[in-house]
UniProtKB/Swiss-Prot annotation:
Chaperone involved in the correct folding and assembly of outer membrane proteins. Recognizes specific patterns of aromatic residues and the orientation of their side chains, which are found more frequently in integral outer membrane proteins. May act in both early periplasmic and late outer membrane-associated steps of protein maturation. This is Chaperone SurA. Its main location: periplasm. PANTHER family: CHAPERONE SURA.
Length: 430
């Protein structure tokens, strides 16, 4: 930023005149600039901090690092990419709320299986304060937000692409349901006699009756099963439908969680299957909400207090009889919905940012929310109506779109970052 350049220039002037003006004072080394990206400086302190972070993580993972000059080059390259992303985030007014930062840190603490106090102590042992860590998380969330937003816009997925994907063998595998199964096998010899078949079937039926009476499936499997997972209590873990033998896959759609199948014969013997749990493949009935909103963005002129006050005034006008849609056309700064009177259409959970979702869930049909803040600015919202919708087919198609998007996202991100580099002024000084 220009402030950084000015500060550096001022400190440089003092450093050069210091010998004449402050002959008895100790000269404090300046923070060296290692790279300039447009009007932003990347300093030696930033580089050293990132190098130390990489060294600590690599040592913990038992990885060898390259020579220092190669490592520095890699890290400067990464810092340049991050700086370009943050520059774009500033340009588009992306803001990450404290609520989003707190939620992200909460997830990290939960995954680490620590208490908050233990986590803070762990950070301190690594020389990182909680405020520094929060700033790092905010930076990461900001970069993710701008990258996802701008790169996703560049990827166009046609309905024909979705159709073609859903017909592919690859898609049949990934969109098939997942099942957590238990398995008991009463095996048959390779060329069984009639007596052997009858004996195995009788044993399988006896085990089935035992299970129906309440016996523990895992204990029965350990004691009686001839299958490869017997010593794991017959637990096959989570398997996709497309991975299962046809015999199993045909039985499962009619089962509920906790059900046990009657013995079913294959060439290998008689199988008893328990469905512990399933996910995917069922009807997806979702609650949808249709809402309108008015967005007022903050600026140097319009701070939070003024934006909130403006929306309170608009809300009162609506309560006094003014039309929400007409006021949205006049006042809303959401370009996408302004001309439709702030109408956001039917939305499923997860469509909007957390602050928006929370208010939408808490606002009753026909009511107008109090002003609330998201990372986009200040809003008021009117919930028009709610409904339940069978989204099974649409959910399947959306899953396909997401998979196509994820496959193309990384490559498109690299292309986008390279375009940002091509358009930027970059001066690496080491």
């Amino acid at each position: 930023m220009q402030i950084i350049k000015t500060t550096i220039a001022t400190f440089t002037a003092i450093a050069f005149t210091g010998a004449a003006s402050f002959t008895s004072a100790e000269v404090v080394p300046l923070d060296r600039v290692v790279a300039v990206v447009d009007n932003r400086a990347i300093t030696q302190t930033e580089l050293d901090s990132r190098v130390q972070d990489v060294q600590v993580r690599s040592q913990a993972a038992g990885m060898r690092l390259p020579e220092a000059d190669i490592l520095n080059k890699q890290i400067i390259d990464q810092l340049i990419s991050e700086t370009l992303q943050l520059e774009m985030a500033d340009r588009y007014g992306v803001q990450v709320s404290d609520q989003e930062v707190n939620a992200s840190i909460g997830n990290i603490i939960q995954n680490a299986q620590m208490t908050e106090q233990q986590f803070v102590q762990q950070l301190a042992s690594e020389g990182v304060s909680i405020n520094e860590f929060r700033a790092s998380i905010r930076r990461q969330l900001t970069m993710r937000s701008i990258t996802e937003g701008l790169v996703s816009r560049r990827i166009r997925i046609s309905e024909q692409e979705v159709d073609n994907f859903l017909k592919s063998a690859d898609a049949q595998f990934w969109v098939s349901p997942d099942y957590h199964l238990g398995h008991i096998l009463v095996a048959l010899p390779s060329s069984p006699s009639s007596e052997a078949i009858v004996e195995a079937e009788e044993k399988a039926n006896a085990l089935y009756e035992k299970l129906k009476a309440g016996a523990n499936f895992a204990e029965v499997a350990i004691a009686e099963s001839n299958g490869p997972s017997a010593l794991q209590g017959g637990d096959l873990g989570w398997r996709k439908s497309a991975e299962l033998p046809t015999l199993f896959a045909e039985l499962l759609p009619s089962l509920n969680n906790g059900d046990v199948t009657k013995p079913t014969r294959s060439q290998a013997g008689f199988h008893i299957i328990k469905l512990y749990e399933s996910r995917g493949g069922q009807k997806q009935i979702v609650n949808q909400t249709r809402a309108r909103h008015i967005l007022v963005k903050t600026s140097e002129i319009l701070n939070d207090a003024k934006a909130e006050a403006k929306l309170k005034d608009i809300r009162q006008q609506i309560l006094d009889g003014a039309d929400f849609a007409e006021l949205a056309k006049t006042h809303s700064e959401d370009i996408g919905s302004r001309m439709s009177g702030g109408d956001l259409g039917w939305a499923t959970p997860g469509t909007f940012v957390p602050a928006f979702e929370k208010t939408m869930a808490e606002t009753k049909e026909g009511e107008i929310s109090q002003p609330f803040k998201s990372r986009f600015g200040w809003h008021i919202m009117k919930v028009e109506e709610r409904r339940e919708e069978d989204m099974t087919q649409e959910a399947l198609r959306q899953k396909a779109r997401n998979m196509i998007m994820s496959r193309r996202f990384e490559d498109e991100t690299q292309i986008w970052l390279q375009e940002l580099r091509d358009e930027a002024f970059i001066d690496i000084k080491i």
